């Protein structure tokens, strides 16, 4: 058959090859196959956010003003979550809630699901972009692996947490002050700061900041004095092949300071990768736990003793009371759909009240 029909040859003008050639061409801004996901999703997510913060009110979902048009500023404007009555609806523009009416869709909070879902896929597209470029230039994929950590945090906080609760309503709205409100909510209703996964996240982020500061200062401190420029930026050519700092000197310095030091650059830089990425992954796992209403550390024996003995108090029992105050103050305003009414005598009083 092969002799009769001839050898099969692939059409060189195959549509896939043409597309592949155009997408992966060397240009100022690389597109790639990942760009087919990244660029449209990022465009729609950012566009939805700018549209919402500029024009769209949160009156119908939260009883709040949330746009520049209503007098908010950059810190107080937000794209707010849908009302709790809409549960986990995707709130599609053409769905049964909005029925193709754009104004109604915005009033119902449709922009939040639009921004959240397109934002999640944009972040995934950016990670795939790093994979694709690394493969093209024959690098290992650690950049993409590292970027999976902020993606995990975004997905756990904005998508998985509200999926575990009664609706998108309990996710953070997209705004600065809105995120602060969400943090207070997390503390008051979940005691988040006493959650071991939050502790690991804080250790990872602050530890990474410390490592970056130490690493940058050490490299600057151990630069070879063989440049004739006035400062670091003038002394060396940015394209030179040879190193401009001494690892041996750095190792000796920190060995004297701490008694231990990194012996090679691979281990040093892997550690700088490992600390923040692991911290963010752990905090994302913790938020998944909160979605299921898992509790933080509970020191019940201290609570019982504090209830029995008015003179006994610890920072833990103090924080428990503060959390109760947050819940009492926030619940009525933050969950208007519940019609919660707290009598004046049960609300906590601060010195200013």
UniProtKB/Swiss-Prot annotation:
Annotated binding of Fe cation, by residue: 215, 269
Note describing how the cofactor binds: The D1/D2 heterodimer binds P680, chlorophylls that are the primary electron donor of PSII, and subsequent electron acceptors. It shares a non-heme iron and each subunit binds pheophytin, quinone, additional chlorophylls, carotenoids and lipids. There is also a Cl(-1) ion associated with D1 and D2, which is required for oxygen evolution. The PSII complex binds additional chlorophylls, carotenoids and specific lipids.
List of residues binding chlorophyll a PD2: 198
Phosphothreonine, modified sites: 2
MF (Gene Ontology): chlorophyll binding; electron transporter, transferring electrons within the cyclic electron transport pathway of photosynthesis activity; iron ion binding; oxygen evolving activity
Classification via Gene3D superfamilies: Photosystem II protein D1-like (1.20.85.10)
Entry membrane topology: Multi-pass membrane protein
List of residues binding chlorophyll a ChlzD2: 118
E.C. number: 1.10.3.9
Main location: plastid
A Pfam family this chain is assigned to: Photo_RC
Entry keyword Chloroplast: yes
Keywords: Acetylation, Chlorophyll, Chloroplast, Chromophore, Electron transport, Iron, Magnesium, Membrane, Metal-binding, Oxidoreductase, Phosphoprotein, Photosynthesis, Photosystem II, Plastid, Thylakoid, Transmembrane, Transmembrane helix, Transport
Modified residues (N-acetylthreonine): 2
InterPro entries: D1/D2, Photo_II_D1/D2_sf, Photo_RC_L/M, Photo_RC_L/M_CS, PSII_PsbD/D2
Compartments, as annotated in UniProt: Plastid, Chloroplast thylakoid membrane
Transmembrane segments: 41-61, 125-141, 153-166, 208-228, 279-295
Positions contributing to a plastoquinone binding: 215, 262
Catalysis performed (reactions): 2 a plastoquinone + 4 hnu + 2 H2O = 2 a plastoquinol + O2
UniProt binding sites for pheophytin a: 130, 143
Further comment: 2 of the reaction center chlorophylls (ChlD1 and ChlD2) are entirely coordinated by water.
Role, per record: Photosystem II (PSII) is a light-driven water:plastoquinone oxidoreductase that uses light energy to abstract electrons from H(2)O, generating O(2) and a proton gradient subsequently used for ATP formation. It consists of a core antenna complex that captures photons, and an electron transfer chain that converts photonic excitation into a charge separation. The D1/D2 (PsbA/PsbD) reaction center heterodimer binds P680, the primary electron donor of PSII as well as several subsequent electron acceptors. D2 is needed for assembly of a stable PSII complex.
Family assignment from sequence similarity: Belongs to the reaction center PufL/M/PsbA/D family.
Protein name according to UniProt: Photosystem II D2 protein
Organism annotation: Morus indica
């Amino acid at each position: 058959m092969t002799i009769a029909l001839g050898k099969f040859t692939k059409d060189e003008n195959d549509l896939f090859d043409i597309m592949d050639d155009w997408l992966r061409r060397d240009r100022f801004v690389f597109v790639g196959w990942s760009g087919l996901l990244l660029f449209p999703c990022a465009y729609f997510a950012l566009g939805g956010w700018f549209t919402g913060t500029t024009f769209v009110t949160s009156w119908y979902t939260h009883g709040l003003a949330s746009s520049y048009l209503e007098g908010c500023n950059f810190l107080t404007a937000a794209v707010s979550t849908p009302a709790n009555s809409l549960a986990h609806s995707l709130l599609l523009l053409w769905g049964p809630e909005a029925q193709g009416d754009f104004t109604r869709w915005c009033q119902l909070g449709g922009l939040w699901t639009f921004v959240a879902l397109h934002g999640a896929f944009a972040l995934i597209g950016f990670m795939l972009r790093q994979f694709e470029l690394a493969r093209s230039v024959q690098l290992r994929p650690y950049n993409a692996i590292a970027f999976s950590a902020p993606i995990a945090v975004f997905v756990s906080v904005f998508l998985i947490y509200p999926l575990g609760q009664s609706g998108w309503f309990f996710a953070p709205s997209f705004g600065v002050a809105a995120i602060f409100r969400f943090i207070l909510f997390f503390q008051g209703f979940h005691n988040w700061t006493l959650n071991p996964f939050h502790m690991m996240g804080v250790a990872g982020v602050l530890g990474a900041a410390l490592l970056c500061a130490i690493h940058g200062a050490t490299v600057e401190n151990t630069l070879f004095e063989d440049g004739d420029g006035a400062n670091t930026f003038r002394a060396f050519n940015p394209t030179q092949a040879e190193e401009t700092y001494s690892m041996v000197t750095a190792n000796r310095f920190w060995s004297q300071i701490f008694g231990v030091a990194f012996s090679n650059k691979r281990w040093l830089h892997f550690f700088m990768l490992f600390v923040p990425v692991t911290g963010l992954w752990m905090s994302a796992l913790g938020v998944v736990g909160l979605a299921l209403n898992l509790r933080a550390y509970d020191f019940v024996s201290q609570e019982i003793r504090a209830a029995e003995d008015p003179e006994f108090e610890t920072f833990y029992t103090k924080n428990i009371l503060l959390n109760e105050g947050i819940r009492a103050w926030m619940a009525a305003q933050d969950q208007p759909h519940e019609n919660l009414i707290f009598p004046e005598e049960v609300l906590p009083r601060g010195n200013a009240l």
